[in-house]
Amino acid sequence: MYNKINFQAERCFHIFYQMCTGHKPEINEMCMLSTDPYDYKYQSLGEITVKSIDDTEELDATDESFDILGFDQDEKNGIYKISASLMHAGNAKFREKPREEQAEPDGTEVRNKRLRQIL
C-alpha cells in the first residue's frame, strides 16, 4: 500500500483530494488539513485535478456511503483522521545521522505534533 501511496505518478487515494476541498470545513479543522493539495507530498506527486471527477461531490458521496454502511460519526471521524494522518506522515523528512545507521527527523517536528494531536 505504501508503494501505491508514494510512488505512482497518478492520483493516489481519492479521499486525500476530497478532504482537501474544504467542502466540509469541520473535517479540515479536525484533521488539521489545508485546502491546498500541494501542501501534501502524496497528492502533489500525481494529478491534482481530473476533469471527470468533482472532489466536492465525491466527498459527499463518500460521507453518505459511510452512513449507508452504518458508521456512526465517531467511526467516520476515525477514518478521516487516519486518512489525514497518512497525508501528514507523507510530509515527514529524515536525515541520516553521520556514521550511524539511524535517521532523525529533519525539521518536521511541527508535523509530528500534528500527527499526535489528530490521533
Locations of regions flagged by a protein language model:
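N-terminal switch/interaction subdomains of large nucleotide-dependent motors and GTPases
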Residues: 1-119
